[in-house]
Amino acid sequence: MENVLKNDWGPLLAPEFEKEYYRKLADFLKEEYSTHVVYPKKEDIFNALEYTSYENTKVVILGQDPYHGPNQAHGLSFSVQPGIKTPPSLLNMYKELRDEYGYDIPNNGYLVKWAEQGVLLLNTVLTVRQGEANSHKGKGWEHFTDRVIELLNEREKPVIFILWGRHAQAKKKLITNTKHHIIESVHPSPLSARRGFFGSKPYSKVNTILANMGEREIDWEIPNL
């Protein structure tokens, strides 16, 4: 898992790939990929950073670890590959979007359109063993993705961090630069969405902040495939 990042994340994150924790993580992943089914595919691990460069990041939506079912994960938090049923949390995200903007719920969960507009869809852990949620927790990815958040925190241009649920909100301690914005609520999971996610209007809050900054707003509508 060497540094394959081709955009501005490459030099920014280069020191991480040389650190002891990352070498141990790379050894662990080499073993995991050769002995188990692991998601996403190796070439998709860093997709969040590939689709959304450092300079172009306007918004961060922080997830936990990748979906662990076949053909779901492709390196973007909450997103699934085309042709795969929309998972429950993402369906609730779409319901909130419908309530905010009147958009129809799309027939897919492929969020590349968001990523291409500057929405960094970052999981805190970037790989998982099939059928075993959190199986790669504590193996080193957290150090790596914390560094991603720290680098964004160091940026002069403001970033909007969307933190849903306690796991994401635990990363608030890394966001110390008062230029940045934090939008938080409970997680869109069916277990918690009715306790404050529905009606929280995260998408229009983002666009209000962007408009006030003179930045292009995010077109949140996901097209049918």
Curated annotation (Swiss-Prot):
SMART domains: UDG, UreE_C. It comes from the Bacteria. The keyword Cell cycle does not apply. GO terms for cellular component: cytoplasm. The active site is at D65 (proton acceptor). It is found in: Cytoplasm. One of its GO terms (biological process) is base-excision repair, AP site formation via deaminated base removal. It catalyses: Hydrolyzes single-stranded DNA or mismatched double-stranded DNA and polynucleotides, releasing free uracil. Belongs to the uracil-DNA glycosylase (UDG) superfamily. UNG family. NCBIfam families: PRK05254.1-1, PRK05254.1-2, PRK05254.1-4, PRK05254.1-5, ung. Excises uracil residues from the DNA which can arise as a result of misincorporation of dUMP residues by DNA polymerase or due to deamination of cytosine. This is Uracil-DNA glycosylase. It comes from Bacillus cereus (strain AH187). The lineage of its organism: Bacteria, Bacillati, Bacillota, Bacilli, Bacillales.
